[in-house]
From Swiss-Prot:
<dbReference type="GO" id="GO:0009252">
    <property type="term" value="P:peptidoglycan biosynthetic process"/>
</dbReference>
<keyword id="KW-0436">Ligase</keyword>
<dbReference type="InterPro" id="IPR005758">
    <property type="entry name" value="UDP-N-AcMur_Ala_ligase_MurC"/>
</dbReference>
<keyword id="KW-0547">Nucleotide-binding</keyword>
<dbReference type="InterPro" id="IPR050061">
    <property type="entry name" value="MurCDEF_pg_biosynth"/>
</dbReference>
<protein>
    <recommendedName>
        <fullName>UDP-N-acetylmuramate--L-alanine ligase</fullName>
        <ecNumber>6.3.2.8</ecNumber>
    </recommendedName>
</protein>
<comment type="pathway">
    <text>Cell wall biogenesis; peptidoglycan biosynthesis.</text>
</comment>
<dbReference type="GO" id="GO:0005524">
    <property type="term" value="F:ATP binding"/>
</dbReference>
<dbReference type="InterPro" id="IPR036565">
    <property type="entry name" value="Mur-like_cat_sf"/>
</dbReference>
<keyword id="KW-0133">Cell shape</keyword>
<keyword id="KW-0961">Cell wall biogenesis/degradation</keyword>
<dbReference type="Pfam" id="PF02875">
    <property type="entry name" value="Mur_ligase_C"/>
</dbReference>
<comment type="similarity">
    <text>Belongs to the MurCDEF family.</text>
</comment>
<keyword id="KW-0573">Peptidoglycan synthesis</keyword>
<dbReference type="InterPro" id="IPR013221">
    <property type="entry name" value="Mur_ligase_cen"/>
</dbReference>
<dbReference type="GO" id="GO:0071555">
    <property type="term" value="P:cell wall organization"/>
</dbReference>
<dbReference type="GO" id="GO:0051301">
    <property type="term" value="P:cell division"/>
</dbReference>
Length: 476
C-alpha cells in the first residue's frame, strides 16, 4: 500500500482572505478531520472542546491551538468559526462570533468548500459509510491517485481519519444526522442504506428524511454518478426520483454489481462480484460479515465506474485493515477462566449491532458471545426499544451499562434498567446491569469462559472501557 505522507500546502486562493479558522467542538472525528486537512493546507487552526482526546492531541501535534473550555476570547483573530452539530446557538463563542460579525458555518459547509474545486466522492447512509469511505480512500491510494480524504473514523492503514493528498480527488463521509450533507456538491455520491435515525432532524417524519436523501443525490451534476445498494428497498423506491445516472450493487439479483458465493472463514470473507459486462471479480476481505462485503462492493463499484484497474481495487481490499472501532480486535487474553478474544465495535443502532453479532457468530463458531453493551442516547433507546430487546437477546451473556446520554436528559422507560427488564422477560438471556464502571472488570471475569468472544458495543465511552480492560489484562 502506498505510504501516506503529510505535506504542507499553500492556502487555496479562493479562501485567501481567510487566515485563521476556529472550530467549536474540535474534538469530534468529523471536525478534527477537516481541521487536519486545513492545517496541512497552511491555515492557522484554533479550536475549543470540553475535554482532551486522541483527536485533539493529534491536532495539537500538527500545530493547532486548542482550549479545553468555551470562552469568548478563544475566537480572537478568527476569520471564520466552524461549529459541530453538537454545539448550540447559546454557546459563548458562537454568540461572540455573531457579535463581531465573524461568519459562523456548519462543519459540512467547510467540507463543501474543500470539495468545491476537487472531484468529490461523498459516501452517505445510515450504516456502513465510515468503512466504505475508508475502503474507497484505500483503493484510490493503491491506484496511485493520492486522494484527500475526510472520514468519520480512523482509517487504520493511514493512521488518521483525514489526509491531504496531491490529486484532485476528495473522498468524504457525508453526514445525514443534521442534514448538513446537503451542502456538498460531489461528482459521485454513494448511499449505503436508509433507516429511520436522527429523526429529530427530520421532525419525526421518515418521508422527509427520504426526500432529503433525494435532494442530496440531486446535488450531483447531470453527468454525475449515484451509487446505491440494491438490497435496500427504500433506496430502490427512491432511485427513479434522483434524475441522475444510478448504478447499484448488492446481493440482489437486480444489482448491477452483484455479489455471489459469499463465504466467511474465521474473520475473513471471500466472494465474487459479477460486473454489468459479465466480468467475474473474486474479492478477499480481512474484515468479517456480509455487511462488509456490501461496503467493499460499494467501494469497488465506485472504483470500477471511475476506471480504476482491478489489481489496485483487489489489493486495497485484501490489505484493508478496517476502520477505527469497527469490529476492532483488541487481542486475545489469558484470564483465570481461560483464553478470550476482546473486540471493540462502534455499532449502536439495532441493525448495526445485529450484523456485528452475525459476523461474530460466523467467525467464532460454537463459541459464546459475551456483549458489553452501552446504549447511546435516551431518544434512540426509546425510539428503537423493541428492536434493541430482540437484537440484544441473541447474545449468550449480556452486560448492560447505563445509557450514554450524549447531552440528553433521561427519558422515563428508556433507560438501561427498563431495557434489561424487557430483555429478561423475553426469556433468552438474563442481562447483568452494571452502573458502576469500576465493577466492570470484576464482573467480566466472573462470567467469561474459555473461548469466549467479548464484544464491547456502543458509541459512548464503552470503547475507552474496553481498552482499559485490554491494558489491564495484557495481551497473550
Amino acid at each position: 500500500m502506498q505510504a501516506f505522507r503529510q505535506r504542507i500546502r499553500q492556502t487555496v486562493p479562493e479562501m485567501r482572505r481567510v487566515k485563521q479558522i476556529h472550530f467549536v467542538g474540535i474534538g469530534g472525528a468529523g471536525m478534527g478531520g477537516i481541521a487536519e486537512v486545513l492545517l496541512n493546507e497552511g491555515y492557522q487552526v484554533t479550536g475549543s472542546d470540553i475535554a482532551e482526546s486522541a483527536v485533539t492531541s493529534r491536532l495539537i501535534s500538527l500545530g493547532a491551538k486548542i482550549s479545553f473550555s468555551h470562552h469568548a476570547e478563544n475566537i480572537e483573530g478568527a476569520s471564520v468559526v466552524v461549529v459541530s452539530s453538537a454545539i448550540k446557538g447559546d454557546n459563548i463563542e458562537v454568540i461572540t462570533a455573531h457579535e463581531k460579525r465573524i461568519p459562523v458555518i456548519q462543519r459540512a459547509q467547510m467540507l463543501a468548500e474543500i470539495m468545491r474545486f476537487r472531484h468529490g466522492i461523498a459516501i452517505a447512509g445510515t450504516h456502513g459509510k465510515t468503512t466504505t469511505t475508508a475502503m474507497v480512500a484505500m483503493i484510490y491510494a493503491q491506484a496511485g491517485l493520492d486522494p484527500t480524504f475526510v472520514n468519520g473514523g480512523l482509517v487504520k492503514s493511514a493512521g488518521t481519519n483525514a489526509y491531504l493528498g496531491c490529486s484532485r480527488y476528495l473522498i468524504a463521509e457525508a453526514d445525514e444526522s443534521d442534514a448538513s450533507f446537503l451542502h456538498l456538491q460531489p461528482m459521485v455520491s454513494v448511499v449505503t442504506n436508509i433507516e429511520p435515525e436522527h429523526m429529530e432532524t427530520y421532525h419525526g417524519d421518515f418521508e422527509e428524511m427520504k426526500q432529503t436523501y433525494v435532494n442530496f443525490l440531486r446535488n450531483l451534476p447531470f453527468y454525475g454518478l449515484s451509487v446505491m445498494c440494491a438490497d435496500d428497498p427504500v433506496l430502490m423506491e427512491l432511485s427513479s426520483q434522483v434524475g441522475r445516472q444510478v448504478v447499484t450493487y448488492g446481493f440482489s439479483d437486480e444489482a448491477d454489481y452483484r455479489i455471489e458465493d459469499y463465504q466467511q472463514t474465521g474473520f475473513q470473507g471471500h466472494y465474487t462480484v459479477v460486473a454489468p459486462n459479465g466480468e467475474r471479480i473474486d474479492v478477499l476481505l480481512n474484515v468479517p460479515g456480509k455487511h462488509n462485503a456490501l461496503n467493499a462492493t460499494a467501494a469497488l463499484t465506485v472504483a470500477k465506474e471511475e476506471g480504476i484497474e482491478n489489481e489496485a481495487i483487489l489489493t486495497a481490499l485484501a490489505e484493508f485493515q478496517g476502520a477505527g472501532r469497527r469490529f476492532d480486535q483488541l487481542g486475545q487474553f489469558i484470564r483465570p477462566n481461560g483464553k478470550v478474544m476482546l473486540v471493540d465495535d462502534y455499532g449502536h443502532h439495532p441493525t448495526e449491532v445485529n450484523v456485528t453479532i452475525q459476523a461474530a457468530r460466523q467467525g467464532w463458531e460454537n463459541k459464546r458471545i459475551v456483549m458489553i453493551f452501552q446504549p447511546h442516547r435516551y431518544s434512540r433507546t426509546r425510539d428503537l426499544f423493541d428492536d434493541f430487546v430482540q437484537v440484544l437477546s441473541q447474545v449468550d451473556v449480556l452486560i448492560m451499562l447505563d445509557v450514554y446520554a450524549a447531552g440528553e436528559q433521561a427519558i422515563a422507560g428508556a433507560d438501561s434498567r427498563s431495557l434489561c427488564r424487557s430483555i429478561r422477560n423475553l426469556g433468552k438471556v438474563d442481562p447483568i446491569l452494571v452502573s458502576d464502571h469500576k465493577q466492570l472488570a470484576e464482573i467480566v471475569d466472573q462470567v467469561i469462559q474459555d473461548g469466549d468472544l467479548i464484544l464491547a458495543q456502543g458509541a459512548g465511552n464503552v470503547s475507552k472501557l474496553s481498552r482499559e480492560l485490554a491494558l489491564a489484562w495484557g495481551k497473550e
